[in-house]
Amino acid sequence: MSFKTLDDIGDLTGKTVLVREDLNVPMQDGAVTDDTRLRATIATLNELSDKGAKVLVLAHFGRPKGQPSEEFSLKKLAAPLAHVLGRPVSYIDWESDKAAVAALTPGAIAVLENTRFFDGEEKNDPAVIERFASLGDIYVNDAFSAAHRAHASTEGLAHVLPAYAGRAMEAELKALQKALGEPERPVAAVVGGAKVSTKLDVLKHLVSKVDHLIIGGGMANTFLAARGVNVGKSLCEHDLTGTAEEILDNADKSGCTVHLPYDVVVSKEFTANPPSLRTCNVHEVAADEMILDVGPAAVEALADVLKTCKTLVWNGPMGAFETEPFDAATVALARTAAALTKEGSLVSVAGGGDTVAALNHAGVVGDFSYISTAGGAFLEWMEGKELPGVAALEG
């Protein structure tokens, strides 16, 4: 994987740089409730500003469906972004963009209005690409989380302007290359979450890539059912047991060991600390019980597996982690991975919305080698798919 970074960009005196960032942050009552994505822009935007470029931020917000609206305007994000960057950020609407850009001074940073106010943005329309390109001299893509989309601002611009990866994009691509591109072996993957159906392509791809595949969450029940285990009234996609068997067969052929729980935490009701809570062997689940977490013996065995590995890719929780005590397996395994990473024996990469929340809950987000905030793009990377926004940067 070869792509140009900000190290290759040269003298920026008198240049205007279009930077695609991800500003699609959660907001409540006009305030940003999680500024993770804003903070991810700091390295790129401040570096370009310090080098004297006029910096224009391209981003989308919500789903305005090609129509301008106050609700989806990026105007309200100029101030929060300025706060995070520690320097002024102005806002430019599409009505006055050319004059406003011309009036900017070297080093100035401005947020352009929502790219999705153009109907052609999501269609990668050449006219929209040209409209964006007319404002700048150089294109920087710093939004890995939008790299799975072939849109005008994420893919099209890279073909008409000199294109570079921003610092956040560069860090993400290097981490992912280390995890699955050219990993140190043995490699383990933890895949959890509620449904097999949402991660079928991930599982199919991983069995040919990793040495150990650890399956948890509700999706483990479908694999247990495929192996003839009665899972009671657990969440289970019985119509996919055939597909689960195929994945297990392919794992055998590829030399990938699949780890399923052999003891589980069950309950008759799904509430915090229910009276019917118990731990049992997977073959002892009663007809009126639900499997809600991986059991402690299996977690201990999985921790031993991680101790033999050099690389870990993690996506999805081991159990219903939002409700105690069904967070125990996720927390214990995450803490093992974090400890191994801190001592230098494991490279750990994790991503996906639920995953970040689960690792936050375990208090280990800062201890993993790399945490991706990308949802769909991270999953598509785990599926082995080419990401248009990344492919356009390669040269």
Curated annotation (Swiss-Prot):
PROSITE patterns: PGLYCERATE_KINASE. Substrate binds at residues 22-24, 37, 60-63, 116, 149. It is an enzyme of class 2 (transferase). Keywords: ATP-binding, Cytoplasm, Glycolysis, Kinase, Nucleotide-binding, Transferase. ATP binds at residues 199, 322, 352-355. It is found in: Cytoplasm. Pathway: Carbohydrate degradation; glycolysis; pyruvate from D-glyceraldehyde 3-phosphate: step 2/5. Monomer. This is Phosphoglycerate kinase. It comes from Novosphingobium aromaticivorans (strain ATCC 700278 / DSM 12444 / CCUG 56034 / CIP 105152 / NBRC 16084 / F199). The gene is pgk.
